Amino acid sequence: MTRQYFGTDGVRGKVGTSPITPDFVMRLGYAAGTVLTKSRKASSRPVVLIGKDTRISGYMLEAALEAGFSAAGVDVMLAGPMPTPAIAYLTRALRLSAGVVISASHNPYEDNGIKFFSASGNKLPDAIELEIEAALNEPMSCVASEKLGRAKRLDDARGRYIEFCKSTFPNELDLRGTKLVVDCAHGAAYHIAPDVFHELGAEVIAIGNQPNGFNINEGYGATAPAALVEAVRANQAHLGIALDGDADRLLVVDAAGRVYNGDELLYIMVKDRMRVRPIEGAVGTLMTNMALEVAFKEMGVGFARANVGDRYVLEVLRERGWQVGGEGSGHMLCLDKHTTGDGIVSALQILSALKRSGLSLAELTQDIEMFPQTLINVKVEPGFDWKKNKELLAEKEAVEAELGDKGRVLIRASGTEPLIRVMVEAKDADIADKMARRIAAKLSK
């Protein structure tokens, strides 16, 4: 069955434009509620937890979802502004039927979305999402008055989640003597992340912690690191941590103002775990720098590539039975700590590696040199299939033969625009650039 509404990360779009409208979101709540009701145990009544980020539209969409669930006979608990991974954790910890997050992650405030978590704190299986889509095609009705769902606030959501985050940091370590700048992107972690690090002993300077409904991700957060770099330097901090709007991704800045991306953070995590207890392998994506693949091989650590997107990294981790993965954008997964990507928890793993080793970020990454990457986007006609272009395939094979084990080629179509992305990695930047241009030229004809 073809998906009509659910993408790789729930339902998302511009507020006021289908499908992110009040009437659709109410129907979505009702459809999800009917699916939950069918699968519930005979003696139990479904209970769903709803959280949101700081977008102004969150109020409207929260009310619409609540109405839909209530009409389906599902009780609702409202957590208010909370990070996406917090809803995953609380759904599991409170033994609820499902969790729902109203967020568009790193997108601007005009966008919003709805994503679901199962009772186990994992993203919904494809089969359940398809059931919900099928239910959306049925007319919406309402259960009898005596069966309507109730709604109440979850008053201690913030405190519960703060304690959970702290529990993922080693008991024998603390952050005393560490000066941190924490950038909350004016998003869902604005009232949580600074306190987590402070309660572990750090001196915390918070920025991007004044949400007004319209400024989420604007000039702050993991997708706009300039503010963090400036604050780290101005405050002479040891480290800076930037989250995105729903706090499921991060990037880190050192005292010198250097930004460390997800590939470098994954390397640090794996290296630290190997120091404590050897691990079997780690998962990156098709875009993960080849330097990690080489380094992990030398360390005796397996490495697998997933499609781009944390959902696919998670799938491969589960298939392999591994625990650590991530992508360059800063979505990190530590399945020995949490069921989903969590920016705060991931930051704590980096901080524990620093504390345990007594080294700086620069020192922890000095033995790995990232391969230069050249990425060229080539506009094509909609529907163009590059895999049927014989000249392109021949050039790709020729370049791969010349690079050998000293580089790699990746060609993929954009999922959102009529573009073909050509990426070449090589130990030498000039070679990477030259090879990428050779391949891209075959697309430009």
Curated annotation (Swiss-Prot):
The keyword Translocase is assigned to this record: no
Active site: S105
One GO BP: peptidoglycan biosynthetic process
SUPFAM superfamilies assigned: Phosphoglucomutase, C-terminal domain, Phosphoglucomutase, first 3 domains
PTM (free text): Activated by phosphorylation.
Molecular-function annotations in GO: magnesium ion binding; phosphoglucosamine mutase activity; phosphomannomutase activity
Keywords of this entry: Isomerase, Magnesium, Metal-binding, Phosphoprotein
Binding-site list for Mg(2+): S105, D244, D246, D248
Gene Ontology annotations for the cellular component aspect, listed alphabetically: cytosol
Catalytic EC class: isomerase
Domain of life: Bacteria
Enzyme Commission numbers on file: 5.4.2.10
Note describing how the cofactor binds: Binds 1 Mg(2+) ion per subunit.
Phosphoserine: residues bearing it: S105
Record field: catalytic activity: alpha-D-glucosamine 1-phosphate = D-glucosamine 6-phosphate
Names of required cofactors: Mg(2+)
Alphabetical list of Pfam families matching this protein: PGM_PMM_I, PGM_PMM_II, PGM_PMM_III, PGM_PMM_IV
Family: Belongs to the phosphohexose mutase family.
NCBIfam families per UniProt: glmM (TIGR01455), PRK10887.1 (NF008139)
PANTHER family listed in its UniProt record: PHOSPHOGLUCOMUTASE (ALPHA-D-GLUCOSE-1,6-BISPHOSPHATE-DEPENDENT), PHOSPHOHEXOSE MUTASE
Function: Catalyzes the conversion of glucosamine-6-phosphate to glucosamine-1-phosphate.
Descriptive protein name: Phosphoglucosamine mutase
Organism of derivation: Janthinobacterium sp. (strain Marseille) (Minibacterium massiliensis)
